Amino acid sequence: MISLKYLLIIFSLLFNSLSSSKDIYLKDLLKKDGIFYEKFSHTPFTGKITGLLEGTFKKGMKYGEFIKYYSDGKILSKINYFENRLNGSWLEYYRNGNLLRKKTFKDDLLEGEYIDYYSFGQILSKRSYVKNKLEGIYKEFYKNGQLHIRKNYKNNILEGEYIVYHEYEFEPVVQIKSKKYYKNGKIEGKFVGFDENGNKIKEGFYKEGKLEGVVFNYNKFGKVLSKIVYEDGLLIEAISYQ
């Protein structure tokens, strides 16, 4: 036969568990030194919050998926935490329900693929992070899906080839609009520009991020239209042949 003392212990444990796991709103919590408390309480909050932001707290820290809503009830974002730190996927949505942004965190730092989307679902840009720093190829796309910009990062700094492409409304053509190079985050060396038919219309040089020497402008037949002379980024002379 279960004793009265044993029943009282069970009841006490159940009551404490229920009271410590109650659902409240974010406005009912206060944050102190990174830990969340209920107002007028000195005990770190454990439980769930409801309303425009839903999620779970354990001992004053965010755990698991937190969902934020627009005022009309549609999902705005889904963010994952572990012990108050961003861990896992971070998803943001347009009001129409389509994905706006997708990224991943590890121990509060961006890690892996990061993608932005147009409101109709097409990819806008794509890049990768390693410990919160951009690393590797970064691509941007026109609304029709054609490649717009292709550049490269090394340890969060632009490095190597930076290419911009023309946009073609109907034809699946990949035509370079401009090409330049980066070294340690600064434009370095030759740059060149092309028209929509692939004709070279501009070329010149950069030195440590500044224009240096002669910049040539051409018409579509290759004839020089003008020469502009730079020194340490400053315009020295401009000559027109038109």
Predicted regions and their residues:
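Bacterial N-terminal signal peptides that target proteins for export
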Residues: 1-7
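Bacterial N-terminal signal peptides
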Residues: 8-16
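Glycine/tyrosine- and acidic-biased, solvent-exposed loop/turn segments at the edges of beta-strands
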Residues: 16-242
